[in-house]
């Protein structure tokens, strides 16, 4: 906002990439081992310190335990039994950020990781469950190796959280995963538009509903962060997560000014366009403009 405010003083156009809490949605049809592998890769790359890292997981309660266990196994496979001793595992950028992240963790809700080393500014890949929107970890962009998992369950349905018209089909009924998808859409749309969104599902209708009704900068179906890696598509946010896009041709166009130029030939000229206009000219102009 400060950049935009300063640029506005000089009428300078801007492109802003502002980050945000990027959701990772996993429904009951997802291939969990593969989903876990790709979530762990995207979340813990550079210790979660990337603008498009999955910030939190929304999942169906029916698969939560299996998903969390698969994520736990993938963390061990990718980073070893003790990630803090892995020389290839990164560290938090500075002490201030390190202590901010520790303040977001809740030991009672931590089911994986939670260890840290203040001397090396390292925090182990951490997973938290039974998280609510009121928890500190959901109050800001995490930008670190902490993955909260929120679940859809019967209690949410009883409160009416999932009852909306976003995802009903032509008959007015929900698909097998419809209630969960409704809830996920509501969760995303009730918060600032994220920079990225990731959806793991084998249900094509559910995929279309998520893409049609969620506002976000960019994302992936059945993967994480790789949309950022191509120069063939623009990258950027929307709303609270930014404006404009760049990468490849889109970046060139974003930072270019297109001028409209007419190179008019001089070997002929149509006098009909010039004053004075009489009845004959008016008829000809009207016929021409049709």
PLM features per residue range, with description:
Residues 1-133, 151-176, 221, 289:
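ALDH superfamily catalytic-core signature
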């Amino acid at each position: 906002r400060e950049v935009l405010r300063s640029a506005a003083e000089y009428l300078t156009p801007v492109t802003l990439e502002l980050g945000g809490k990027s959701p990772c949605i996993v429904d009951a049809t997802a291939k969990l081992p593969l989903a876990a592998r790709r979530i762990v890769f995207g979340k813990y790359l550079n210790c979660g310190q990337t603008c498009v890292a999955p910030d939190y997981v929304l999942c169906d309660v029916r698969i939560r335990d299996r998903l969390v266990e698969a994520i736990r196994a993938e963390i061990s496979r990718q980073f070893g039994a003790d990630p803090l001793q892995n020389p290839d595992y990164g560290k938090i950028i500075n002490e201030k950020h390190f202590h901010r992240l520790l303040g977001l963790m809740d030991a009672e809700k931590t089911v994986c990781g939670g260890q840290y080393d203040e001397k090396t500014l390292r925090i182990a890949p951490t997973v938290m469950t039974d998280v609510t929107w009121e928890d500190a970890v959901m109050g800001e962009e995490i930008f670190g190796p902490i993955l909260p998992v929120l679940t859809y369950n019967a209690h949410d349905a009883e409160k009416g959280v999932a009852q909306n018209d976003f995802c009903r089909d032509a008959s007015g009924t929900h698909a097998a995963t419809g209630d969960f998808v409704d809830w996920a859409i509501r969760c995303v749309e009730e918060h600032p538009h994220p920079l990225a969104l990731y959806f793991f599902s084998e249900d094509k209708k559910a995929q279309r509903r998520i893409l049609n009704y969620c506002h976000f900068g960019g994302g992936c179906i059945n993967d994480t962060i790789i949309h950022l890696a191509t120069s063939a598509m623009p990258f950027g946010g929307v709303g609270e997560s930014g404006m404009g896009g760049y990468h490849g041709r889109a970046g060139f166009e974003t930072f270019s000014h297109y001028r409209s130029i007419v190179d008019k030939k001089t070997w002929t000229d149509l006098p009909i366009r010039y004053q004075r206009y009489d009845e004959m000219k008016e008829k000809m102009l009207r016929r021409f403009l049709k």
